[in-house]
Amino acid sequence: MATEYALRMGDGKRIYLTKEKIIAEIEDGTANAADLGEIPALNANEMEKLAEILMMPGKTVSVEQGMEVPVTHDIGTIRLDGDQGNSGVGIPSSRLVGCMTHERAFGADTMELGHIDYSFKPVKPVVSNECQAMEVCQQNMIIPLFYGAMPNMGLYYTPDGPFENPGDLMKAFKIPEAWESMEHAAEHLTRDTVWVMQKLFASGADGVNFDTTGAAGDGDMYGTLHAIEALRKEFPDMYIEAGMAGECVLGMHGNLQYDGVTLAGLWPHQQAPLVAKAGANVFGPVCNTNTSKTSAWNLARAVTFMKAAVEASPIPCHVDMGMGVGGIPMLETPPIDAVTRASKAMVEIAGVDGIOIGVGDPMGMPIAHIMASGMTGMRAAGDLVARMEFSKNMRIGEAKEYVAKKLGVDQMDLVDEHVMRELREELDIGIITSVPGAAKGIAAKMNIEKLLDIKINSCNLFRKQIA
């Protein structure tokens, strides 16, 4: 009897497949992506490697030593303190505690602060509260800390916003009116996002994470690209990550263009150059999970799309890897076996520069991804490599080489806790364990500035305050 291997369906249900069936599913999945995106399918060696990853006997798997990448985040601390029946585990804790838990306990390379409603529009009335939270977090933390939110253009339509719902207008065959409503909403999205981030950047934020760009279609992406462009023009040193909502930009409007390119119907490899042109430092491509297909099919399809995006992108790519994207099952508690295999495949086959950790409980998302492919933040040198990706748009290889040279170590040492524990204390750039007298918060980041020859926004704010 043929050996069967434990895999998952796209909804997380466990299934058992033979190697022959796994290979067939991989071939079908990569062919689907190649056909839709008009991109190369995985070659025979890549498909064989993906099959090997899926068939590994361990519950968890990880990248080969030396291939680790930095992680970024969506939803911020909501996975800890959120309690809405989704992936939040409802731990009553402040956002400072949540952010520092990711930094000190989870070994995150970066982190983000976000509002419980997690969209830019609801932040406007409480922006002063967000600014104070950002200041307090920056005073206590060392890893890069973003402000994250969704552009969420749907909030600008009735009954939540001022503009008539284009869906209702289209049903009434009022197409020009629907276009006009989307265009007005996109303008307001740009304006609100820029205004919110002007306040947060003045409060020390390292940058911004645009989560689920394009969720409301091409108008949503249009407004976000113009927001990125405006922020880059005003703040040349702001870290900007733009993560997508889906693999293909929905043509709700159909005629909107950016830099002469029609946005409707763009696939990840076509989205990447536009996001870079707008001024983002890091692009977060997406491939949606099909819940009725196997993990072999979904992961092959996702890796195919991401490999093409990485090759086409002028900037680092942090593939979105929350539940329901990136070959990961659509389940609030994502199966760790599926998450770690997807994480490994994205790094070793697609060649991504990082992982954007998305929605899912703490064990199934940040802990699983960081164990599988992360650089473990301040336990080693993950935060330093992440800063070079964002401050200088360095791809993963260049960023590691730069940091290793500055530290005077081999690249393998960047993820060696024994080497980095001693070195971080010697250089006074922040250590993960609490040592009296060691530089913390702003002081440690000022030493990182000197080490890496960069400027850090929270340090600039502190210098202004004591001038």
From Swiss-Prot:
Q: Which gene encodes it?
A: mtbB1
> What GO molecular function annotations does the UniProt record carry, in alphabetical order?
dimethylamine methyltransferase activity
Gene source species: Methanosarcina barkeri (strain Fusaro / DSM 804)
Q: Does the keyword Transferase apply?
A: yes
Catalytic activity, reaction form: Co(I)-[dimethylamine-specific corrinoid protein] + dimethylamine + H(+) = methyl-Co(III)-[dimethylamine-specific corrinoid protein] + methylamine
Pfam family of this protein, just one? Dimeth_Pyl
- Primary role: Catalyzes the transfer of a methyl group from dimethylamine to the corrinoid cofactor of MtbC.
Family named by the database record? Belongs to the dimethylamine methyltransferase family.
Q: Which UniProt keywords apply?
A: Methanogenesis, Methyltransferase, Pyrrolysine, Transferase
Q: What is this protein called?
A: Dimethylamine methyltransferase MtbB1
Q: What pathway does this protein act in?
A: One-carbon metabolism; methanogenesis from dimethylamine
Which domain of life does the UniProt lineage start with? Archaea
Q: Which EC class is the enzyme in?
A: transferase
Q: What is its EC number?
A: 2.1.1.249
Q: Name one GO biological process term.
A: methanogenesis
